[in-house]
């Protein structure tokens, strides 16, 4: 088994897609207008617009009963939101400045950890509150 794609279920689809376009500096592949896009950034990172399916379900189109039951169940369940997306860059100092200049929101200070090996990183949040950790093995 292999992980082929990670989905972010977005409540702010357009804003989240724009955020990742700026951060990743690439255009996504569009598979279904306004339902999901996919970024090729090492592995695949997809942004999924739940409102698209919700609108279709309300019109009773495109889905079987099992999907609708699961979709509605997932809406009511409390979720664990503790996920960190880890991105690597060769030049952390340059990337830190670039991300700050995009003015996408709060950017943490650069942090340093040395447990197994030196590790430098900073965090930003996407419009849905997911943590992006941008890291490097040096900060020169």
Residue map of PLM features:
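Short secondary-structure junctions
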Residues: 24-31, 106-110
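Conserved short beta-strand elements that form part of the metal-binding/catalytic scaffold
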Residues: 27-79, 131-136
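Short glycine-enriched loop/turn motifs at secondary-structure junctions
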Residues: 1-2, 76-82, 116
């Amino acid at each position: 088994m292999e992980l082929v794609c990670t989905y972010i279920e977005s409540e702010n689809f357009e804003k989240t897609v724009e955020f990742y376009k700026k951060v990743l500096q690439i255009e996504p592949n569009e598979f279904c207008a306004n339902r999901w896009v996919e970024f090729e950034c090492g592995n695949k990172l997809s942004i999924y617009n739940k409102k698209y399916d919700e609108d279709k379900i309300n019109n009773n189109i495109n889905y079987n009963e099992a999907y609708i039951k699961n979709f509605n169940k997932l809406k009511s369940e409390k979720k664990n939101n503790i996920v960190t997306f880890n991105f690597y860059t060769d030049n952390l100092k340059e990337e830190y400045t670039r991300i700050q200049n995009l003015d996408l929101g709060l950017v943490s200070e650069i942090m340093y950890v040395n447990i197994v090996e030196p590790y430098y990183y900073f965090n930003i949040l996407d419009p849905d509150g997911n943590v992006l950790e941008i890291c490097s093995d040096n900060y020169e």
